């Protein structure tokens, strides 16, 4: 891959975006299977159809954001890149978890390990995602005020 060494670290964003786009594609086919009423898909996703749709759309949105930050070619600190890549997955996976485990729809009534860990996972995901994309947005915005190099 030919890339300016100054932006090489941002390749993580490109890799994550491609992976999460593939996840969205797989979920799109799962939505087709669910809509056709194929029993195997309903067995895998016993939760609400809308949760699979939300996961699909969120993976698409997160992929688009990651592709956009990569395309901006603004160097980002490693911790921001990783927070964006991880947060893009965890944020989308919250909907997927609810589709796979319907008991998570009402965590206050649910019991067990999944019900106990879900609120912690949710808050960690929101914090990581907010930090990554928030800091990334501030970094890109600040870069627009820097003097352009002379040509």
Question: Can you annotate each of these PLM segments?
Answer:
Residues 1-9:
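Short, Lys/Arg-rich, polar N-terminal cytosolic tail immediately upstream
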Residues 9-34:
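N-terminal signal-anchor transmembrane alpha helix
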Residues 23, 27-29, 49-72, 86-96:
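Core segments of alpha-helical transmembrane spans in multipass integral membrane proteins
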Residues 30-45:
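Membrane-interface helix-loop junction between the first two transmembrane segments
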Residues 45-58, 112-123:
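Short aromatic-rich membrane-water interface segments that cap or initiate transmembrane helices
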Residues 59-69, 124-137:
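Hydrophobic cores of alpha-helical transmembrane segments in multi-pass inner/ER membrane proteins
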Residues 76-93, 148-151:
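Cytoplasmic juxtamembrane regions at transmembrane-helix boundaries
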Residues 94-110:
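Transmembrane alpha-helical segments of integral membrane proteins
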């Amino acid at each position: 891959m030919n890339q300016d060494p100054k932006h090489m670290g941002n390749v993580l964003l490109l890799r994550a975006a491609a992976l999460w786009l593939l996840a969205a594609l797989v979920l799109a086919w799962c939505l087709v299977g669910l809509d056709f009423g194929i029993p195997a898909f309903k067995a895998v996703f016993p939760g609400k159809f809308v949760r699979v749709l939300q996961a699909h759309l969120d993976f698409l949105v997160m992929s688009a954001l990651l592709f956009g930050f990569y395309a901006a070619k603004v160097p980002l600190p490693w911790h921001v890149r990783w927070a964006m890549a991880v947060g893009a997955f965890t944020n989308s996976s919250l909907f997927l978890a609810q589709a796979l485990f319907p008991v998570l729809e009402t965590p206050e009534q649910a019991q067990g390990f999944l019900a106990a860990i879900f609120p912690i996972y949710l808050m960690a995901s929101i914090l990581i995602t907010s930090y990554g994309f928030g800091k990334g947005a501030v970094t890109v915005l600040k870069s627009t005020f820097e003097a352009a190099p002379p040509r």
